[in-house]
From Swiss-Prot:
InterPro entries for this protein: Glyco_hydro_79, Glycoside_hydrolase_SF
Domain of life: Eukaryota
Regulation: Hyaluronidase activity is inhibited by Mn(2+), Cu(2+) and Fe(3+).
Activity at various pH: Optimum pH is 6.5.
EC code(s) of this entry: 3.2.1.36
Keyword field: Glycosidase, Hydrolase, Transferase
Entry protein name: Hyaluronoglucuronidase
The species this protein was found in: Hirudo nipponia
Reported temperature dependence: Optimum temperature is 45 degrees Celsius.
GO MF annotation terms: hyaluronoglucuronidase activity; transferase activity
SUPFAM superfamilies hit by this protein: (Trans)glycosidases
Recorded GO CC terms: extracellular matrix; extracellular space; membrane
Length: 489
């Protein structure tokens, strides 16, 4: 048994995250004829219930294909209006292939209607990514010559107004311009594009009330955050980052347990703060607009298993501690990192982890000091969510939720003297049979599963008198009589 001293400064609030902290991503490639849309029923009552288990939150429709997504095309559309290449240079060929591959990416009105119904019915907000790669004035081999073509977006905006949509829709423009742009967009262009989008949205007051976020870039594209701040900082609600720890194709179980990866996320946050340190928009909120464990769709038989939860839980805690307002998980289904099985909609372990977190953890965040030089025990503390309908126990204001993970090889007891003798409600998540690659997760020894397609009640273990975690497990501890002043508000 290893004892680790933990101090929680519950007198000082270090951050406050959004009530809609959790989000899930839906890849726009599913709208493609070659995508998986035919296998996905977004009108399923089961899906409504599962999304409600993460609400209030964001349902993001985005990804690389969003860059090329068109709205309700008819048979007479002429693609050449957007592209008129005359030469046959390698650059032309590359861009043309990308265009031909994506040009069939067409969002039907009926599908958009279903997306609005899904998000409203599950108490989520629809975050919709517009097609930044549809441009005019582009010349091969030149930068800074093209401008975003807003005509497709305006078709969608006009349709939203005609249907009375808008009260639960937020907007993005483009996906990873630092990585997937066929136009080699510059930071300045991205800023100008967002300024243009804001101007268009001003014509539609019912739509302009929603958030406008971007630029949706990863580690290598942090300079685009500065470009957006400089070009359209007054018009965006938040800066969005994409974050993955490693290449899912070259990773295994040991990668997901490697404590050295925990610091990668903090390095990203620090890098963004440094880039914006002299900007008048340095205090603009940050979101993780798309994030998971490994890029390239995750790791087969790992990303959708219990072991993926260590990085997931640490990300939720560390993001909140850095005042990151929203964390959007890639992806609801599809790839190896899907939260749900795309055929049955049965939840994978990370869904259950996020659901428990969403049911127990409030938005007020406190500083935590952990005396563990190995970094294998990670601990976070936030006010308890007191209005959850999914927990058997009902908690009062003043309660504190401590959540922790242990990737080490021995039992760990968190020595938190300030809460010694307090009542502890434990929610410990473990894999079935102790197998880290199990797709079944147990809550206090009982399997978490749907009951007639309904979410089960989350029952606490009230017998524990210490904050203890077995090797390679994670869990939540609610201190119901912590009497934290900041949690009484």
């Amino acid at each position: 048994m290893k004892e680790i001293a933990v101090t929680i400064d519950d007198k000082n609030v270090i951050a406050s995250v959004s009530e809609s902290f959790h989000g899930v991503a839906f890849d726009a490639s599913l709208f493609s004829p070659k995508g998986l849309w035919s296998f996905v029923d977004i009108t399923s009552p089961k899906l409504f219930k599962l999304l409600e288990g993460l609400s209030p939150g964001y349902f993001r429709v985005g990804g690389t294909f969003a860059n090329w997504l068109f709205f309700d095309l008819d048979e007479n559309n002429k693609w050449k209006d957007y592209w008129a290449f005359k030469d046959k240079t390698p650059e032309t060929a590359t861009i043309t292939r990308r265009w031909l591959f994506r040009k069939q990416n067409n969002l039907k009105k009926e599908t958009f209607d279903d997306l609005v119904k899904l998000t409203k019915g599950s108490k989520m907000r629809l975050l919709f990514d517009l097609n930044a790669e549809v441009r005019t004035g582009y010349e091969i081999g030149k930068k800074m010559t093209s401008t975003w073509d807003s005509s497709e977006a305006e078709k969608l905006f006009k349709y939203c107004v005609s249907k009375g949509y808008g009260d639960n829709i937020d907007w993005e423009l483009g996906n990873e311009p630092d990585h997937t742009s066929a136009h080699n967009l510059t930071e300045k262009q991205v800023g100008e594009d967002f300024k243009a989008l804001h101007k268009v949205l001003e014509k539609y007051p019912t739509l302009n009330k929603g958030s406008l976020v971007g630029p949706d870039v990863g580690w290598m594209g942090v300079s685009y955050v500065k470009g957006l701040a400089d070009g359209a900082g007054d018009h965006v609600t938040a800066f969005t980052l994409h974050q993955y720890y490693f290449d899912g194709n070259t990773s295994d179980v040991s990668t997901y347990l490697d404590a050295t990866y925990f610091k990668k996320l903090q390095q990203l946050f620090d890098k963004v703060k440094d880039v914006l340190k002299n900007s008048p928009h340095k205090d603009k909120p940050l979101w993780l607009g798309e994030t998971s464990s490994g890029y390239n769709s995750g790791t087969k038989d790992v990303s959708d298993r219990y072991v993926s939860g260590f990085l997931t839980l640490d990300k939720l805690g560390l993001s909140a501690a850095n005042n990151v307002k929203v964390v959007i998980r890639q992806t609801i289904y599809n790839g190896y990192y899907g939260l749900l099985d795309k055929n049955t909609l049965e939840p994978n372990p990370d869904y259950w982890l996020m659901h428990v977190h969403n049911s127990l953890v409030g938005n007020t965040v406190f500083k935590v000091d952990v005396s563990d030089p190995t970094n294998k025990a990670r601990v976070y503390a936030q006010c308890t969510k007191t209005n959850s309908k999914h927990t058997q126990s009902r908690y009062y204001k003043g309660s504190l939720t401590i959540f922790a993970l242990n990737v080490g090889d021995e039992d760990v007891t968190l020595k938190i003297d300030q809460y010694s003798g307090k009542k502890i409600y434990s929610y410990i998540l473990t894999p079935e049979g102790g197998q880290l690659t199990s797709q079944k997760v147990l809550l206090n020894g009982k399997e978490l599963k749907l009951v007639s397609d309904q979410l089960p009640e989350l029952n606490a273990d009230e017998s524990k008198t210490s904050f203890t975690l077995s090797p390679k497990t994670f869990g939540f501890f609610v201190v119901s009589d912590a009497n934290v002043e900041a949690c009484k508000k």
